[in-house]
Amino acid sequence: MVTRWLYSTNHKDIGTMYLIFGAFSGVLGTVFSLLIRMELAQPGNQILNGNHQLYNVIITAHAFLMIFFMLMPALMGGFGNWFLPILIGAPDMAFPRLNNISFWLLPPSLLLLVSSALVEVGAGTGWTVYPPLASIASHSGGSVDLAIFSLHLAGVSSILGAINFICTVFNMRAPGMSMLDLLFVWAVFITAWLLLLCLPVLAGGITMLLTDRNFNTSFFDPAGGGDPILYQHLFWFFGHPEVYILIIPGFGIISHVIATFSKKPIFGYLGMVYAMCSIGILGFIVWAHHMYVVGLDIDTRAYFTAATMIIAVPTGIKIFSWVATMWGGSIELRTPMLFAVGFLFLFTVGGLTGVVLANSGLDVAFHDTYYVVAHFHYVLSMGAVFALFSGFYYWIGKITGLQYPETLGQIHFWLMFLGVNITFFPMHFLGLAGMPRRIPDYPDCYAGWNAVASYGSYLSITAVLFFFYVVYKTLTSNEVCPRNPWETTPGVSPTLEWMLPSPPAFHTFEEIQV
């Protein structure tokens, strides 16, 4: 039994392990976020006794856990592995053993990340790991080095997974299936290209930081002719595509869910594909909008402002196409659809604040305030995460063969929806009022909205606990999931996974699909 999971080369088993790993890391990351909100519940030192370094270690750990160990493993590793081969009619991934090591690089990576927080003073650098704060002068112990090794392992894991997905889509499609068939497949395919192109840049940047810290190089040290701004360019050339890596698989899931529960095919299919490709390409040429305050030329800032705003165009195409799909559809508001509609609304809010932040003039005021925190939590904590839950409720019956309890799923949605909005909406006001990020204490004038935000986070925690109760009920109540639980209308042919039994056999498609 142990060897089945340890040595597994089966895409479904590996996908399941990714999902369990993502759930575990997500709980860990959620605990850190709760600590942050408890510290910020009132002015003054609350639970960390004025330990600013520890506060920043918690912030850093929260970010790394949620991004590299929750969202990416669950969306790409979990749903990507589970459903991409099934959707294209392939028996498995192109390189099943590569798939195995892609997963098994993650637990050691997580171990290194946790170790970095536990040795010396921890890595209190923020997830950006900027020097000179991350240099040996300011973080003298082994913490930052451990965090860098953790990132290296997670990066190798993602690159190998990306190569696997790309080869699978190119080479493993069933006869007669064109490249242009399903939006989730497109989403994973585009995301894989982004990973493949941007992770090596991160690897280079953090390796240079590693040698600066340990081998006396001075890539980022002005005393030796280096420049810390170079690190920012390298990091954000990875960091901006990274946020699209987190959201694009979510786009794919949302497209499938909205089409299924509106009982009609997606509106503007080809436009959706081109929009995702455009977002992927544009994501690589806007990185310096994270750096408006470092002293870029005026013309550079003008270019990055314009380029960043252009990303709103394909994103808008996607939003309106989803709305157009629902328009005139026979909408059924089951839990996956609730999360998808919630995604639409909240992702749009996050996108609007993104357009505000794209302006280099305005961003000088907003940079490093809670306005930025509000913006990226709207697109991540309510965009990517809602897409994740939507996909979970959509596919859990197919994965386990057991259907979730509908009422409990809907309760989970409303708890979550209220919780995250009460947490993050007030942060816009705090940011406009100038409250800085990454600081564990604040003047009394910010007390009101911080208290509200902290109460919101307690509600979100309740929602997370309730979600695990829903999972428990699903796995123990034995409500068998039929082949296709979402009785799709005759006019709309269901995608390939709904033609298989729930759960599918260990080896699907033993004969070629036509």
From Swiss-Prot:
Q: Where is Ca(2+) bound in this sequence?
A: E39, G44, P440
Placement of covalent cross-link 1'-histidyl-3'-tyrosine (His-Tyr) = H240-Y244
Catalytic activity reported = 4 Fe(II)-[cytochrome c] + O2 + 8 H(+)(in) = 4 Fe(III)-[cytochrome c] + 2 H2O + 4 H(+)(out)
The record ties this protein, via InterPro entries, to: Cyt_c_oxase-like_su1_dom (IPR023616), Cyt_c_oxase-like_su1_sf (IPR036927), Cyt_C_Oxase_1 (IPR000883), Cyt_c_Oxase_su1_BS (IPR023615), Cyt_c_oxase_su1_dom (IPR033944), Cyt_c_oxidase_su1_bac (IPR014241)
**Topologically, how does it sit relative to the membrane?**
Multi-pass membrane protein
* Binding-site positions, O2: Y244
Q: Which residues bind Mg(2+)?
A: H367, D368
Q: Which PROSITE patterns match?
A: COX1, COX1_CUB
Quick check: keyword Iron in the entry?
yes
- EC main group: translocase
Q: Name one GO biological process term.
A: mitochondrial electron transport, cytochrome c to oxygen
The cross-references to CDD domains, in alphabetical order and at most eight, read: Cyt_c_Oxidase_I
Q: How is the cofactor bound?
A: Binds 2 heme A groups non-covalently per subunit.
- What residues bind heme a3, as annotated? H375
Describe the family membership recorded for this protein in Swiss-Prot or TrEMBL: Belongs to the heme-copper respiratory oxidase family.
- Role of this protein: Component of the cytochrome c oxidase, the last enzyme in the mitochondrial electron transport chain which drives oxidative phosphorylation. The respiratory chain contains 3 multisubunit complexes succinate dehydrogenase (complex II, CII), ubiquinol-cytochrome c oxidoreductase (cytochrome b-c1 complex, complex III, CIII) and cytochrome c oxidase (complex IV, CIV), that cooperate to transfer electrons derived from NADH and succinate to molecular oxygen, creating an electrochemical gradient over the inner membrane that drives transmembrane transport and the ATP synthase.
Q: What is this protein called?
A: Cytochrome c oxidase subunit 1
What is the native source organism of this protein? Prototheca wickerhamii
